[in-house]
């Protein structure tokens, strides 16, 4: 049986405006110089959980998590207008550009 890595806290958080009225909550954990990995939570509605930070070795990976439109700490909460697959892809690209990441592993 595999176990998760130890609990960690984010070293940076961001609030990223995307298509109005949505603002995404984004956080970074682990090694700022590590291999970038993006965690995608299920949805709509749930958001990521703190234990989701623990899937990857924080010494090796730059772990990026964000709450999708209407979920978790993103605002407005439970607002699903404009929550489409194409919008999600656009939001993921906006997060990647915000953080200056060229390529990353996508998990979720």
Model-predicted regions and their roles:
Residues 20, 83-86:
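Conserved phosphate-coordination/catalytic loops
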Residues 2-23, 28:
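N-terminal cap/lid segment of alpha/beta-hydrolase-fold proteins
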């Amino acid at each position: 049986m595999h176990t998760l890595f130890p609990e960690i806290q984010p070293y940076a958080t961001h609030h990223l405006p995307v298509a109005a009225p949505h603002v995404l909550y984004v956080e970074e954990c682990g090694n700022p110089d590590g291999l970038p990995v993006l965690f995608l939570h299920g949805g709509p509605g749930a958001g990521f959980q703190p234990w989701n930070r623990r899937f990857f070795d924080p010494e090796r990976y730059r772990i990026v998590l964000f709450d999708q439109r209407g979920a978790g700490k993103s605002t407005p909460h439970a607002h699903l207008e404009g929550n489409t697959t194409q919008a999600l892809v656009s939001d993921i690209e906006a997060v990647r550009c915000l953080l200056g990441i060229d390529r990353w592993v996508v998990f979720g």
